Amino acid sequence: MMIKVLLLLSSALVLFTPEAEGGCGCHTECSLQCSFSGCGYVCGLRCRCSWGK
């Protein structure tokens, strides 16, 4: 079970790569909950991801 979680986490981090490339960034702690819509990620109810700084 733990291995599956780690695999999901690592693939999510790859998908939501860095703001340095000019894309949308996502906080690590909510990247698994992000759904992509245009350039706004909505992460669960508490986190919101936006353009990288």
UniProtKB/Swiss-Prot annotation:
PTM notes: Contains 4 disulfide bonds.
UniProtKB keywords: Amidation, Disulfide bond, Nematocyst, Neurotoxin, Secreted, Signal, Toxin
Cellular component GO terms held in the UniProt record: extracellular region; nematocyst
Signal peptide start and end residues: 1-22
Modified residues (Tryptophan amide): 51
One Gene Ontology molecular-function label: toxin activity
Functional description taken from the UniProt entry: In vivo, only causes a weak change in behavior in shrimps (C.multidentata) (slight twitching of the walking legs), but no lethal effect is observed. No activity is observed when injected into fly larvae (M.domestica).
Protein name (Swiss-Prot/TrEMBL): Toxin CjTL7
Organism for this UniProt entry: Epiactis japonica (Sea anemone)
Lineage: Eukaryota, Metazoa, Cnidaria, Anthozoa, Hexacorallia
